Amino acid sequence: MTETISVVIPVFNNRATLAELGDRIRHTVEPQRTLELILVDDCSTDDSWTVMAEIMRDSPSRLVAIRTPRNLGQHGAILLGLSRARGAWCAVLDADLQDRPEAIAGLLAAAAGCDAVFAGRRGRHQGLVRLLTGKLYRALLGALAGVPSDAGTFCVLRREAVECILALPVTTPSFIAMIGLARLRAKSLPVERAQRGAGHSAYSTGLRLAVAWRMLRCVLEYRFRPADSAIGATIGTWAAASTMRDNSGAVVDPGEPPL
């Protein structure tokens, strides 16, 4: 029986790239491994959900599509997708094709003795100001959380590492910071970023500052947590809130979450 890899992708207004992304992931993962593709539509305002349904209908692979009842942000959507994953390994990448699916194989090959391998960002496909602020943010993240300074959300993780991350007692999620806070054995592998497949980045300057603030809150919240803090409550609430469909025909709609 082949090993299963779960590929988790947060989706926000990515209808133009989803079909190509799904094809490239399948060609990269199969047939060496069994693919579980998990797409999390984080309240897109375009037709991303419709495209996801079409991919699910046409795909021979196991595909799980989750639609959040409210916008969780990229990191919240990633953690929700990971909470549904069943693979021995999990890969996380963006839906805009800047994270090249073909790099997953190299990250897995470099994972011996590690819990997580980041795709160390290489290549400049953004303005100078955004490039410099991004470097500053990742340097701060590395100093506070202990992850590689070139780490981004594109990474592969062992099943046990995912469980450690989801068990962290934080209510302000910052996915990359949580990998560091869980004290996982992590490293980075240089990976060239591609040009954006379509559209433009949803990260305005204000939103990038908000992400940095959430990262700082996540780290401080964990460092100064009470000894009896609840484990995994936030992720459990998000998981219960979602609508999930897979290509077995199952539809689960638990309704709105308690807020």
Language-model features: where?
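Conserved donor nucleotide-binding strand/loop of the catalytic core
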Residues: 34-36, 49-84
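A conserved acidic beta->alpha catalytic loop
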Residues: 41-50, 97-98
